[in-house]
Amino acid sequence: MNDTQHTPPFIAVVPARLASTRLPNKPLADIGGKPMVVRVAERAVESGAQQVLIATDAQAVFDVARAHGIDAMMTRADHPSGTDRLAEVAAHYGWRDDMIVVNVQGDEPLIDPALVRGVASHLAATDGCAIATAAHPIHDPADVFNPNVVKVVPDARGVALYFSRAPIPWARDAYQPHWPNIAQMPAPPAPAAVYRHIGLYAYRAKFLRTYPSLSISPIEQAEALEQLRAMWHGERIAVLVTNDAPLPGVDTPDDLARVQAFFGSSA
């Protein structure tokens, strides 16, 4: 992990909602004797954030956070995304324009605190960017062609050129449009490294306050990728490249069982 030597002050916000179709009440799922959302917040604390808080529209999540000594804020229930929820929090607290706010997903109890700290540092070190995120190289050809694996192409400065569910960049001489078997595809050629986007974001508070006023963009709708809204409106996104893939989050009961085993708990 390439981390800036002097990490700037930053705030970590954990958006959490109970309305999960695949895993109801996910933030409250027990992981080693603590609710998942608390485990996530503890990772955020380990990152060195000067403030960690849980943003939720559920009273049960708010109460659990406070019971474990974690700051929490009740937000509106009609937010279409976690970024919109963060925008409400930023407006409520009135953080200064250049304060860095990291969105730590509430279903990532195994998130590496160094990665949280890293995206905050990367944003502070990259002039002209309102957002920072992370990515790692893809080595499995199946992931290159998997639309559920979001790819990102950064420029020479490490600023995102585009995010897509499609295989980008397309290595013209290495790939054929109709492979009979994905398993037979070659790994991405070195000159055209393919990066998998990691869904961790750091924002400047000024951007968060303007985000709700940005109109939904055609490319955001086509790709179903929220970050493309910011790019459509001219914002630049810095990309921190790390060699290691993060441990997966919790989306399904099987994911939960795996994480519970990691923490030595029982389902």
Swiss-Prot record:
It catalyses: 3-deoxy-alpha-D-manno-oct-2-ulosonate + CTP = CMP-3-deoxy-beta-D-manno-octulosonate + diphosphate. Keywords: Cytoplasm, Lipopolysaccharide biosynthesis, Nucleotidyltransferase, Transferase. Signal peptide: none annotated. One of its GO terms (cellular component) is cytosol. Its EC number is 2.7.7.38. The keyword Glycosyltransferase does not apply. CDD domains: CMP-KDO-Synthetase. GO terms for molecular function: 3-deoxy-manno-octulosonate cytidylyltransferase activity. Pathway: Nucleotide-sugar biosynthesis; CMP-3-deoxy-D-manno-octulosonate biosynthesis; CMP-3-deoxy-D-manno-octulosonate from 3-deoxy-D-manno-octulosonate and CTP: step 1/1; Bacterial outer membrane biogenesis; lipopolysaccharide biosynthesis. Gene3D superfamilies: Spore Coat Polysaccharide Biosynthesis Protein SpsA, Chain A. GO terms for biological process: CMP-keto-3-deoxy-D-manno-octulosonic acid biosynthetic process; lipopolysaccharide biosynthetic process. It is found in: Cytoplasm. Activates KDO (a required 8-carbon sugar) for incorporation into bacterial lipopolysaccharide in Gram-negative bacteria. Belongs to the KdsB family. This is 3-deoxy-manno-octulosonate cytidylyltransferase. It comes from Paraburkholderia phymatum (strain DSM 17167 / CIP 108236 / LMG 21445 / STM815) (Burkholderia phymatum). The lineage of its organism: Bacteria, Pseudomonadati, Pseudomonadota, Betaproteobacteria, Burkholderiales. The gene is kdsB.
